[in-house]
Amino acid sequence: MRTPSKQEDLVKAFKALLKEEKFSSQGEIVTALQEAGFDNINQSKISRMLTKFGAVRTRNAKMEMVYCLPTELGVPTASSPLKNLVLDIDHNHSVVVIRTSPGAAQLIARLLDSLGKAEGILGSIAGDDTIFSTPAPGFSTEELRDAILNLFDQEL
């Protein structure tokens, strides 16, 4: 069983390796960590860590598919202000579309619905990272968009 300091060292080393954007397989990550002195590491542990930290495979500058930790899709934490979870707000003639960090849409939609008609919100529908919000009678989508922008202190 690893001591907490060794676990923290493993996490730091793991994140540092992924920032290099040169590992195309989990096996390569295992080998690199073993070479760094983490001998009790295997592919299944790497797989769990990749999932836990939200790692994705993407193309690097050399157009190779590699694992990385995308900063814009960071996992929300207890200390994340809600405004940091809202990525984009747009509208058309009938609906306001709000894009959030993955997993944050239902939280943001619940907040919007709690404000209700007084703020111009008739209702909201949320998926994983997208919210559709429709204006209450007497409000335009542009007014609703502006109210939501002000609520989240955004300048999009």
Curated annotation (Swiss-Prot):
What's the protein called, per UniProt? Arginine repressor
- Keyword Repressor on entry: yes
Could you tell me where this protein is found in the cell? Cytoplasm
UniProt KW keywords: Amino-acid biosynthesis, Arginine biosynthesis, Cytoplasm, DNA-binding, Repressor, Transcription, Transcription regulation
Q: What is the lineage of its organism?
A: Bacteria, Pseudomonadati, Pseudomonadota, Gammaproteobacteria, Enterobacterales
Any Gene Ontology CC annotation: cytoplasm
Q: Name one GO molecular function term.
A: DNA-binding transcription factor activity
Q: In which pathway does it act?
A: Amino-acid biosynthesis; L-arginine biosynthesis [regulation]
Function (record text): Regulates arginine biosynthesis genes.
Question: Pfam families attached here?
Answer: Arg_repressor (PF01316), Arg_repressor_C (PF02863)
Q: Which NCBIfam families match?
A: argR_whole, PRK05066.1
* Similarity field: Belongs to the ArgR family.
GO biological process: one example: protein complex oligomerization
